[in-house]
Amino acid sequence: MRKRQVVLRRASPEEPSRSSSTASSLTVRTVRYGECQKNHAAAVGGYAVDGCREFMASRGEEGTVAALTCAACGCHRSFHRREIETEVVCDCNSPPSTGN
């Protein structure tokens, strides 16, 4: 299985330059492709899946057509269930609190 990670950096809109008084957040999205959902019996009016449990990229460079084909079942990556995990990390810069 090959994972793809997308990182987005967000800052507040009124922040043209970075200062210590504003907060920004970091959003990390990890995309994973699960079981194959291709209906192999659609041509005859039935429903049958091949049982492939997760996408494994074929031998190919990232971004080529070969990398979009599953090595286990031979289907295109779009037939596999897409799972997105999103993690938001706040980079908050707040003054330390006093124990009153």
Swiss-Prot record:
The keyword Zinc-finger appears for this protein: yes
GO molecular function: DNA binding; protein homodimerization activity; zinc ion binding
Gene Ontology cellular component annotations, sorted alphabetically: cytoplasm; nucleus
Keywords: Cytoplasm, Developmental protein, Metal-binding, Transcription, Transcription regulation, Zinc, Zinc-finger
Domain of life: Eukaryota
Positions of the UniProt region annotated as Disordered: 1-26
Tissue expression as described in the entry: Mostly expressed in stems, flowers and siliques, and, to a lower extent, in inflorescence.
Zn finger intervals (ZF-HD dimerization-type): 33-83
InterPro entries named among the record's database cross-references: ZF_HD_homeobox_Cys/His_dimer
Cellular location(s): Cytoplasm
An example Gene Ontology biological process: plant-type ovary development
Keyword Transcription: yes
Location (main, coarse): cytoplasm
Subunit text: Homo- and heterodimers. Interacts with ZHD1, ZHD3, ZHD5, ZHD8, ZHD10 and ZHD13.
Function, in words: Inhibits zinc finger homeodomain (ZHD) transcription factors by interacting with them to prevent both their nuclear localization and their DNA-binding properties. Involved in integrating signals from multiple hormones by regulating the expression of specific genes.
Protein name: Mini zinc finger protein 2
Organism: Arabidopsis thaliana
Gene that encodes it: MIF2
